[in-house]
Structures are given as C-alpha cells and as structure tokens.
C-alpha cells in the first residue's frame, strides 16, 4: 500500500456496552471478508486500547472506571489510525479482562482497504470522529444491554453476577448517560435493535462495499 492519504477507510461503530456493536462488526467483517478477502478488511476493538495498568495492583485495577473516556488510550488509537491511513502497519495492543491490563503480546496489523473500529467511547473523541469516513451508533435499550452484559461477563470474563451488577449501577449506566448516549448525535447512521437487525446490516454492507469498487 502506498502513502496516499485516506486510502484506508475507517468505519466507526459505537453504542452502549453489550448493545450489539461487536456482533455487527464481526458480521460485517465475516461477510465482507468472504467477498473481498482477508487482506482488504480488518477489525479494531476499542477495548484493545484500555490503558496499560501493569504499574497498579490488582485491587487498584479493579477500581478503574472502564466506562469513562480517561480509561482509554485514545492518543495511541488516534496515532494508529493515522499510521494505517498513511500505509503503515501497527502493533495492535491486546487487553486481558481477567488481569485488567494490557497483555505483553500484540497483533501485527497491516493497512487494509477498510478498517471497522468498534467501541463504546469512539464518538466521544473528536480526533477519532475526524478519522472516520462514516460512523454508526447501535441504539439498544439499556435493560437489554444489562442482561446481555451479565451473561457475557459471567460466562466469558470470569465475573460474578454481583460484581457485574455493582459495576453497572456505579459506572456503566451513569457513564452511558453522561458520555455515550450524548455521542449518538455524531453518528451518521443509527441502528436500532442491535446486532440482529438484518436489514440494517445489509444496508451497511452495501454502503461499505462501495469502498471496494
């Protein structure tokens, strides 16, 4: 890939935790990859850019408000998006939900024709918004998000139900109302009903497919 500006198209998918962002991103990636090939499309989760907390104790890490913009290393994410757009590869961080910090390993990611970026706080940062070619907000009722989050965090991330509920009441819901929901105004497309909205996914596929022509 050359250094031609904006050759890498960035598509942002935001919304509440457990709203269906990852499902939409993975569905779009899988179905478009089958059409154009793995070398032309990739996915970057915002969760990979939670700040490194290896200098903190486990007790301190647990107290971090992971739903506040300050928990994210958006400076690094912004830098990586600029690198990809200028034709340079990046080392994508990996985050451990059980250790509450970054892993030592990274994933080498070459520039792609299209990068799908998904995460809860993407649209809160003007720099990230300006790097996106277009953005999507997945608008799912909070009670549904809570049920999905409890199932996911208990089954996949080793959390207890009590800790998930306590975190939801203390930070997840308040931060959604303060930061995430207001960022919906910056989205180009709002998708209701989450990742199982097949009509919305087909419309998004058609839109993204234009970048491969």
From Swiss-Prot:
**Which residues are connected by disulfide bridges in this protein?**
none
Offer one example of a GO biological process linked to this entry: UMP salvage
Quote the pathway field. Pyrimidine metabolism; CTP biosynthesis via salvage pathway; CTP from cytidine: step 1/3; Pyrimidine metabolism; UMP biosynthesis via salvage pathway; UMP from uridine: step 1/1
Q: Which UniProt keywords apply?
A: ATP-binding, Cytoplasm, Kinase, Nucleotide-binding, Transferase
Q: Where in the cell is it found?
A: Cytoplasm
Q: Give the EC number.
A: 2.7.1.48
Please name the GO terms that the record assigns under molecular function.
ATP binding; cytidine kinase activity; uridine kinase activity
An annotated GO cellular component of this protein is: cytoplasm
> At which positions is ATP bound?
15-22
User: What InterPro entries does its record include?
Assistant: P-loop_NTPase, PRK/URK, Uridine_kinase, Uridine_kinase-like
Known catalytic reactions: uridine + ATP = UMP + ADP + H(+); cytidine + ATP = CMP + ADP + H(+)
Top-level taxonomic group: Bacteria
Question: Can you tell me which residues the record assigns to a coiled coil?
Answer: none
Keyword Transferase present in the record's keywords: the answer is: yes
Q: Which family does it belong to?
A: Belongs to the uridine kinase family.
Extract the NCBIfam families matched here.
PRK05480.1, udk
Protein name per the record: Uridine kinase
Q: Which organism is it from?
A: Serratia proteamaculans (strain 568)
